[in-house]
């Protein structure tokens, strides 16, 4: 219970430990009445009046909130980056796990001295049919770069990006802090090739599009900022009559006045089931969905 936040170490832009947020939410849940938690099962069929679980049990209901979220892009699809092929090519999700364990190390056990972070892996990429922006990757890359510099002050950290999209409160300030306080390097350009070297490092090729110059860089570790992709369960939701966007995310009833409502009365949405969002936005949507459910029940 807790969704994707369980795998995070600290949350941007305040660097609040994810465990603190989860603990506070679980405490509030434990103090609430008339709530039954079912784990180790999933919904196999959803309608406004009945939810069928994988255990075979049917739950009768008057409203349903679907908050099945999103999943992460499989970095192995982008073979040119070497994930699953070369040592020390990891994803942003892998790095969060390392932060949680307190062990950010190379496969040899040594500390990384030079680290590259690549933005937009599986986002804004027509070649892999992921045209959407995953929204939180840029700020995640900045947050992780700062955490790496806090762990290894002498290390060189490079962020390779197409565009830096700092949309939230405190994000732009964190981006500036990464450059001014932590001396994180930002290079505008995508990495075109990754290859191993004879001394067990990684050589990356890219182009600095601001200077128009090709770039070769030897690094100890490459972090791939993987984007959000729609949950595979959305296909079965579409088969049940719910509308799905071309991106694979579910289509809300209205982007402005019904963003937590579906096209079927009595079924509501919350979180990244409809689009990439940060933690705060997902929590706010859950609150909005709860209010909409209350309104719906009071009308019946």
Please place each PLM-identified region on the residue numbering.
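Residues forming the flavin
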Residues: 1-300
């Amino acid at each position: 219970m807790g969704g994707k936040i369980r795998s995070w170490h600290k949350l941007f832009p305040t660097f609040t430990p994810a465990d603190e947020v989860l603990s506070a939410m679980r405490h509030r849940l434990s103090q609430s009445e008339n709530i039954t938690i079912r784990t180790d099962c999933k919904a196999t069929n959803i309608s406004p009046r009945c939810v069928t679980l994988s255990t075979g049990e049917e739950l009768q209901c008057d409203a349903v909130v679907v908050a099945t979220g999103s999943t992460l892009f499989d970095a192995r699809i982008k073979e040119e980056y070497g994930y699953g092929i070369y040592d020390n090519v990891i994803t942003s999700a892998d790095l969060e796990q390392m932060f949680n364990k307190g062990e950010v190390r190379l496969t040899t056990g040594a500390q990384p001295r030079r680290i590259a972070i690549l933005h937009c892996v599986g986002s804004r990429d027509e070649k892999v049919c992921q045209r959407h922006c995953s929204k939180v990757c840029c700020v995640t890359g900045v947050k992780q770069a700062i955490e790496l510099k806090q762990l290894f002050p002498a290390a060189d950290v490079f962020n390779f990006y197409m565009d830096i999209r700092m949309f939230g409160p405190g994000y732009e300030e964190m981006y500036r802090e990464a450059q001014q306080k932590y001396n994180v390097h930002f290079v505008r350009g995508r990495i075109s090739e990754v290859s191993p070297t004879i001394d067990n490092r990684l050589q990356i090729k890219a182009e600095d599009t601001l200077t128009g110059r090709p770039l070769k860089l030897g690094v100890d570790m490459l972090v791939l900022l993987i984007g959000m992709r729609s949950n595979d369960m959305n296909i079965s939701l579409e088969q049940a009559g719910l509308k799905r966007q071309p991106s694979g995310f579910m289509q809300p009833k209205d982007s402005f006045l019904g963003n937590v409502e579906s096209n079927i009365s009595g079924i509501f949405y919350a979180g990244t089931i409809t689009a990439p969002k940060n933690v705060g936005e997902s929590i706010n949507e859950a609150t909005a969905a709860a209010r909409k459910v209350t309104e719906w029940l009071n009308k019946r």
